[in-house]
Amino acid sequence: MVFVTGATGFIGAHLLYYLISGGNEILALKRSSSNLQYVKNVFRYHTRDWETLFNRINWTDGDVTDYDSLLEATQGIDEVFHGAAMVSFDPGDMYKMLNTNIRGTANVVNAALENGVRKLAYISSVAALDPVKENQIITEKFFGNFPQRYSNYAESKFKSELEVWRGTEEGLNAVVVNPSIVLGPCIPMEGSGSFFK
């Protein structure tokens, strides 16, 4: 079974569709206040049989900042796709965002380790990477110090990646992807979609 956090977001909703379409059994985390209409719209975009596929998703209420709910949700899970994160460039959201993103990722990593999850895929951000020189190739070994001039969001993603790498040192099989601006069908008008307002 595959566990997905951030399932109600842009990347997460499309990921859910592709995982379900591939025959995977899914457990998706959502907040009790989440509106699933956006996820349904993404499924509707991809297929006429959207409702059948959507109804195959097992949903669980929880929050990445609640370790106990994650520990329970990851029991019997083989793979985790962790995409839940708060995105904000409002300085007033700094502490909430740092807590949600860093502590939330630490909780996901710890629950995965505790329950013997086979693999974790963490959806980070290009914001977490050091600046690169023109035409420089970035590999898995490219990891430097966090440049302080970046945003609080970048800091939260960088420090979240540190939690994932800590997990790998403790035996977790994990990968990190660092998307930049993510565009595609059904894009909401927040996050990358805000560029189109």
What positions do the PLM features span?
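Conserved sequence/active-site signature of Rossmann-fold short-chain dehydrogenase/reductase
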Residues: 65, 128, 182-184
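NAD(P)-dependent short-chain dehydrogenase/reductase
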Residues: 168-197
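Active-site Tyr-X1-5-Lys
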Residues: 149-175
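Active-site beta-alpha turn of Rossmann-fold NAD(P)-dependent dehydrogenases/reductases
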Residues: 84, 121-124, 180
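Glycine-rich phosphate-binding loop and adjoining beta1-alpha1-beta2 segment
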Residues: 30-52
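N-terminal Rossmann NAD(P)H-binding glycine-rich loop of SDR-like oxidoreductase domains
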Residues: 2-24
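NAD(P)H-binding glycine-rich loop region in Rossmannoid oxidoreductase-like domains
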Residues: 44, 48-100
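Conserved Rossmann-fold NAD(P)-dependent oxidoreductase catalytic core, especially the SDR/UDP-sugar
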Residues: 94-95, 100-152, 175
